[in-house]
Every structure is written in structure tokens, then in C-alpha cells.
Amino acid sequence: MTSDKNINLWIEGVQGSGKSTLLQELVTMNPHLKVCREGDYSPVELAWCAWMNKEQYEAVLARYEEISEEIKKYTVKEGDRFIIMYTRILTDIPGFHRDLEQYEIYNGRKKYEEIKNIVISRYKAFRDTGYVFECSFLQNLTEDLILFHEKNDEEILELYQELFAALDKET
């Protein structure tokens, strides 16, 4: 791979296929790349992250006051939303991860139109380059569309055409 900073790379694949190994090799060879692994903050993907409004965020900080600084450390504010990389927080507080899991957008937690709007708006807002994304385009969204929204191949392809158009900097 060249050291071109004007591209983004998307690594997809089934579990155990070597995605993380490939990602690490790419970053070793191209240290300028910004890495978005599953569970990290990503400008396009919300898997393994809690996505909440201000009231929900403040309630979580109050409920888990003893680790509120750690929560803040793993939070990114994006518009009027707060994104917590909660799976990165190591704690032995019973139920913490399960509690924050309810704020994820996947696994049937959002209606189809809502998840579609969230995902498309994030892709439209993303205009940066120099990223390498792990499991950020196909895996989590496709799984959600099939398992929880019962979308057929044509409906899934239509949404991905919209997402691809949103990423196209010429449109």
C-alpha cells in the first residue's frame, strides 16, 4: 500500500478471518492512518458504543458516579448526542455493561427508519480521509437489517447504495 493519505480503507470479514491482523499490518506500514477498531469511537460506526441524548448521559454519570471520570474519558460528544465507548471501560460494577448496552443502535434497539437515518446522516457528515475501519460498513448494519428488521437482499442493497452515495465526495 502507498502512503496516500487521501483514501479510507474498510476491512470486513467473518470472525477469525484475520481482520485485526491485517489492520495491524496496515498501520505498521502506514503509521499515519487513523484506526477505528470495533468498539472505538468512529465517525461512521456505532457498534459497541452507547448513543444517547444529554438527559440519558447525565443519568448514566449520576448512576455510575464512582466511575464517572472514566465514562467521560471514553465519551465523544457529537452534536446533541453523547457516544460512550463503554466496552473499553474496565469495571467490576455489576450490570454496568448490560445497562449501557441498551443505548446501542443495533440488535433491534431502533426502528428501521431511525437506524437508517442515524447511519446515513453519519456517513453524509463524514468527509475525512486517512482512516482504516474494522467492521464498519457491512457487518453490524447488515446483521441488524437481516435479523431484526427482516430486510431482503434488495432492501439491503438499496440502503447500501444510499450509504455509498453518502460517502462519495463528488455527490
Whereabouts are the PLM-identified features?
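Hydrophobic anchor at the beta1->P-loop junction of P-loop NTPases
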Residues: 11
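ATP-dependent NMP and nucleoside kinases share a basic, alpha-helical "lid"
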Residues: 102, 106, 110, 114-128, ...
